[in-house]
Every structure is written in structure tokens, then in C-alpha cells.
């Protein structure tokens, strides 16, 4: 589809991302790397797609699931924790969940964990019975407590959860943990992981059937081409035929070796995509096994 194609407003794809926060810049970098560019409006909340009919809405992260559910946006980049919290809340209130996770994006990783004061002698989850747990994720926590048959009081807070035990409003907390530095600063220690989270691409379960369908398929393919190649490199080298089996065993995280046309040098030209770190030590090990002229090339994007 040409970038100059003019579509009705309802046929322009809309993507919501966090206006300001830890997912904002990685989300914009991902979309930009997929070939999208925008013209920003005066209020800086709406970005009109220029390279393709794909517009961007800059909103609060906790508004994104609702905007998708209402059909205001077709897609959203949001933390799995926020998406699952609102989905759990809808289910507990007897409401349908009209959105789904389309792709994990492998950035913004964190964990939702129970954390207790450092002076606690933690043994097992039976210690949670009758306790007050402060959290910004009451629906996820309620489901977890119900699954484990634990009767505890949930204290819902919109922020500053980690200070609740020191204020006496809760006995422990359930909150997101990245490095753990915030817990340490508030004399807390993590004891149980409730869930792992990362940034995800979310969208409606019922996909659009108009011109947006083609845009969505194209965008998903480009995102796959970026995300699937994260931490991957193209490895190229020369080797004699009798060394290929040994070299293959040294590349367990690589795609099958591809032999390029013979150039008459007597050795085979070989390339493969490696999906793990290629250190100097690995290159030297490959060289000892018979690889010659080793080259490691960064791959920015790919269409499989």
C-alpha cells in the first residue's frame, strides 16, 4: 500500500502507547524500526501517521486496555501486568474480555511479587492468612489468593505501595519488581512471584475486516521480523566439508547451516543465524574446529 493512499478515518490503524513512562521510548523505537513515522499534534496526544495510515495515541498505560475494548484503538503496547489486571477485573465483574495478547515484545520485563518486611521469618504461604496486603493489582492478587485458598485482606492503593507496611496500613505488599532496589530501600524482601510481565502488543479478539486488516497483517509481520531477531547475528565463515558436523555441534542455538555457491577456493562458504551471544571465546572455538574467515554481522530486520 502506498504511503500516499488516502483512507477514510475508520480505515486508519490506531495504536495506543504509554504517553510517559518506562515503556514509552522502547515502544516508539520498535514502531519506528517497523517503518512508521508520524506528525505530532499540538496537544502531543495524537500522532498522525505519515509513512503509512497508522496513527499513534499517547495515553496513560492503564487507559490502553479500555481503549482497545471500546474499539477506539486497534492495538496497544502495554505491560502484561496492566492488561491482565483489567482482564481479571472484567471477569470478576461478569464482563467479557474483548482483547488479547498478540505478541510478547521482550522489553519492560518485571515481576509481580509478594514482599514482606525484612524482619519477617518467611516460611510458606500459610503465613498470609488474615494478613493485609497492599497492592495496585487487586484483581490479579484476588485470583491468586482464591487459587491458593488463602483468606487475606486486599488493601487497594494507586501508588506508593511499598511504604504501606511502614505506615501501618498493610502487613505486606504485592507490587512490581524490576531490580529489587526499591524493595531494599523500604526494608522489604520478595518472597513469592505472582506473575512475570513484559511489554506486549494487545489487540481486539475480533480483528477488523476492512482496510485495517491488511495494515495489521503487515505490521505484525514487521514486528515479528524485529522481535524474533533480538540478540541474533548472522555468522559467516569458510570450512571444508569434513568439518561441518563438528561446527554444527558447536552451534546449538543456530539455524541450520546454509551453504553458499562454491567460489572455487576449495572450501565451502557457510552462513547461519545465531540466536545467542557470539563471544570471542565462541569464535576461537569455531576456528579451532575448522572455521576460517569468521564474520559476525548484526541483523536489524528480516521477513521470514
Curated annotation (Swiss-Prot):
Pathway: Amino-acid biosynthesis; L-histidine biosynthesis; L-histidine from 5-phospho-alpha-D-ribose 1-diphosphate: step 1/9. Keywords: Amino-acid biosynthesis, ATP-binding, Cytoplasm, Glycosyltransferase, Histidine biosynthesis, Magnesium, Metal-binding, Nucleotide-binding, Transferase. It catalyses: 1-(5-phospho-beta-D-ribosyl)-ATP + diphosphate = 5-phospho-alpha-D-ribose 1-diphosphate + ATP. It is found in: Cytoplasm. This is ATP phosphoribosyltransferase. GO terms for biological process: L-histidine biosynthetic process. Feedback inhibited by histidine. Belongs to the ATP phosphoribosyltransferase family. Long subfamily. PROSITE patterns: ATP_P_PHORIBOSYLTR. One of its GO terms (cellular component) is cytoplasm. The gene is hisG. NCBIfam families: hisG (TIGR00070), HisG_C-term (TIGR03455). GO terms for molecular function: ATP binding; ATP phosphoribosyltransferase activity; magnesium ion binding. Catalyzes the condensation of ATP and 5-phosphoribose 1-diphosphate to form N'-(5'-phosphoribosyl)-ATP (PR-ATP). Has a crucial role in the pathway because the rate of histidine biosynthesis seems to be controlled primarily by regulation of HisG enzymatic activity. Its cofactor is Mg(2+). The keyword Amino-acid biosynthesis applies. The lineage of its organism: Bacteria, Pseudomonadati, Pseudomonadota, Gammaproteobacteria, Lysobacterales. It comes from Xylella fastidiosa (strain M12). Its EC number is 2.4.2.17.
